[in-house]
């Protein structure tokens, strides 16, 4: 476990996080699937009665040590029992059990903190939505933050056809075929709302603060939203991968992309070490000088000026 932790916080931790995504997909379709289907008195050889779309750090293959796992549950139009109302209840029951099993705290900890608030309609909507309901919602939505969230969308469970149908629905919502200059204004509004909330904090936040992780992600996502509809090379979920494509497409200078990549990797390393130390989701640099020194030493900085 220690060896895995040390390996994870090297400069390669973001590039190699595909294993984390695969592990979640295996767990979701493995033991958790069996429990969910058993509770529904269904054949264990069947798939889950819905597909799972990952967003956020899981969708982008960028998990850290204490990431929330943002998911959306979507089902196709295939019937389970022949009764639509009963099918809906079965799907909701399976979804609740899946969340409970994956979030359950045991002696070994828990698999994931699952966050379902990014689903269409948020907490006001059912846990599982049909593909048609999801498409109708996004067709009517004008919220930039939802387009940004779906940049990271990646199927992690469900039938291959459902996954394909979901992504075919998501892509046109995120990536517009015509250049939309309103993107700049809308992204700026989202950023300002985050900054207003962050200004209430007294401590330095490496995620939401000026020059932090979120600012780099917003910079990259703005290019994706502007040009991704006409340049499919930008339709990627990982921040580092998109930076490489921004170089290849000459949308930003190579040196600028390299500086952003270096800053992003450094801030993510700090994030990992903060969460290893605090054992919870933390993005705040400690105010204590002693704790700051301890954090710096854990990052490999040995010769620290004591003044």
Where in the sequence are the language-model features?
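A nucleotide- and high-energy phosphate-metabolite-utilizing enzyme signature
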Residues: 1-20, 24-26, 31-307
């Amino acid at each position: 476990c220690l060896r895995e932790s040390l390996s994870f916080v090297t400069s390669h931790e973001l590039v190699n996080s595909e294993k984390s995504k695969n592990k979640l997909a295996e767990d979701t379709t493995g033991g958790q699937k069996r429990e969910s289907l058993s509770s529904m008195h269904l054949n264990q050889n069947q798939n889950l009665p819905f597909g799972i779309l990952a967003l956020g750090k899981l969708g982008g293959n960028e998990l850290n040590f204490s990431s929330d796992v943002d998911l959306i549950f979507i089902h196709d139009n295939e019937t389970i029992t022949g009764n639509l109302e009963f099918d809906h209840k079965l799907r909701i029951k399976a979804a609740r059990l899946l969340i409970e099993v994956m979030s359950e705290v045991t002696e070994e900890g828990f698999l994931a903190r699952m966050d379902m608030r990014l689903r269409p309609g948020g907490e006001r909507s059912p846990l599982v939505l049909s593909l048609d309901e999801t498409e109708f919602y996004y067709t009517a939505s004008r919220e930039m933050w939802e387009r940004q969230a779906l940049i990271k969308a990646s199927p992690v469970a469900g039938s291959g056809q459902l996954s394909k149908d979901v992504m075919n629905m998501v892509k046109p919502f995120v990536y517009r075929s015509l250049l939309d200059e309103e993107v700049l204004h809308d992204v700026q509004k989202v950023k300002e709302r985050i900054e207003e909330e962050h200004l209430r904090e007294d401590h330095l936040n490496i995620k939401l603060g000026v020059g932090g992780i979120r600012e780099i992600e917003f910079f990259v996502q703005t290019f994706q939203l502007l040009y991704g509809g006409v340049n499919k090379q930008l339709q990627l979920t990982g921040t580092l991968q998109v930076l490489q494509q921004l170089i290849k497409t000459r949308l930003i200078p190579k040196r600028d992309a390299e500086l952003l990549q270096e800053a992003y990797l450094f801030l993510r390393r700090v994030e990992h070490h903060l969460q290893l130390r605090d054992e919870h989701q933390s993005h705040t640099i400690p105010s204590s000088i002693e704790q700051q020194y301890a954090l710096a030493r854990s990052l490999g900085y040995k010769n620290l000026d004591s003044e």
